[in-house]
């Protein structure tokens, strides 16, 4: 049986995480969490250990003081990868978690920045993730900068955007040019479709390709071990996703 759209996203996230030693995942992030769990399972088969810190999970989180420890650990350089989203994301990697329109009269209002600015500055591999891929989300310029994708020359910064994964495509971020580069397009979509649904300009990789399907072994891991582990923090997501197989 072929992979569902969400299973393909989980496999894509795991691929983006290849090479990390410690990945942290914030709240309300089932697909990034599943991708991190898949990365751990795949690396274990290669004899390599990956540490996970899944906020909201009792079994897959070594923090005892929640987000306070997350920020301390990140500031000490002990987290290799983290995920951020945004109500708006622009072509320079800036994210808006506050609201649309002129602040402080933004409408709608979103949950808030929650320390995203710090994590964006210090975590080397920040992966931006949004299932929705539309001009409403991917705008030319965000209305409010919760966390800046780039900094001025001379500003010491160890972290920043590394990749963008959406329901339609995968991009990498070119920090030197401050632009996203389209590297993969998910099946049943094309380049024109991506351009129509993206409100900012982007480059295309020379080796632009269709997102590969997860192989049988990877798909079995997702549907077995990964979903079993994910159910600790996201039981409803697992039930719904397994029901669509």
Task: Pin down the residues of each PLM region.
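N-terminal active-site beta-alpha-beta segment that forms phosphate/nucleotide-binding
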Residues: 1-67, 78
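Intrinsically disordered, low-complexity segments enriched in small residues
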Residues: 3-24, 160-178, 201-245
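Charged/polar, solvent-exposed surface patches and flexible loops
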Residues: 15, 37, 72, 196, ...
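Short amphipathic alpha-helical patches
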Residues: 36-40, 59, 97-98, 217-222
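Short, surface-exposed, charge-dense and proline/glycine-enriched linear segments
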Residues: 54-60, 114-118, 233-245
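Conserved phosphate- and dinucleotide-binding cores of soluble alpha/beta proteins
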Residues: 59-215
